[in-house]
């Protein structure tokens, strides 16, 4: 019990619950009513309130809950933060290995800081735009993994919170150039591909990331975590360029130079091989495809006279790119065979990369090269119909190879020969359809993102030639 000082009428009226006092003075009689206690108080006599509340029949009684503090947070406020952060890093690692298994394991040694290391190194940073974006992805992953709608609802809330935080950071050019802003934008873009909140939302994300990369400049993506961000998202930029009908800005000389510097840097690594060099050169060829598609479409809109002037140079560029990609395909097969040579079937590792991931990544990259050759063949048919018979035969072999190695979970999207009959009237035209839609999207527990990135973005589009 605590002693109530003179003049504290409101305390008496409220009849607050009190805590025991180490030196109580005078206890009231159990038979005394509240009115009798009040009369003693007014006469100047000390009144000691009981340590328990008055009976519930009193209309003036008031009870207030006392908030409880978590013991860990009370003793050391950082304990809870550290525990949550540790769990978050582990869940993010599981998410990356589920969504990007082959691509991550085959590229993690090519970057100074990979994505898992970056998340782990951030320590107890939990109230930032990037961390909200990461938690949005991991919550969606857990919701899909355990079929729990609570996680999915929470992930959307975190997604919108991260978007607002990203908007605040973009208000300053200095912060807009930071690694955290680009990393947040990339994580949110990946989240959007899995959720498809609107048909073109992922394209808006891609446009924003393209702007951020240009603002930062190529050199910002050569070292540190910048390289990891660039390597993982550059493939989606090819997808976006094809869907939008535009050339990919990575084809520009300064960005081509960046890719060449990355390839040269990779060649100096202890884990480097002909395999990684061929992969980089294959990417350099594929980034030209969106620009060639755009130029071919523009060619079809020209008059016959103007078309006759422009077409030879364009056809030569397409054929040169196709020849280069064919060479890459052959070299890649040789490089893979060299790495496999001397390996027993039961061996766990092929070089520094586990056999499972190596085989998966090799298969997907080869598929991406075939898809690139298929698109280039379509462009040649549009400009030079005389090559139709030869190209039909080659396309049949390419599609047959891809059907045998088909990994897509969408049977309805199996590849067919989408060529117009050779004698059909009218000009054939190229149709590019996005496969990042509400109907074709896959959850983050699948390797859908892995298939897109490892095929250099070409797995996310369906290209056909129609008349």
UniProtKB/Swiss-Prot annotation:
Highest taxon in the source lineage: Eukaryota
Record flagged with keyword Secreted: no
Ranges where the record places region Disordered: 1-60
Keyword ATP-binding in annotation: no
Description of what induces expression: Up-regulated when grown with elevated levels of potassium chloride.
Keywords: Stress response
Entry function: Involved in osmoadaptation.
PANTHER family linked to this entry: C6 FINGER DOMAIN-CONTAINING PROTEIN, ZN(2)-C6 FUNGAL-TYPE DOMAIN-CONTAINING PROTEIN-RELATED
UniProt name for this protein: Uncharacterized protein AN5342
Organism: Emericella nidulans (strain FGSC A4 / ATCC 38163 / CBS 112.46 / NRRL 194 / M139) (Aspergillus nidulans)
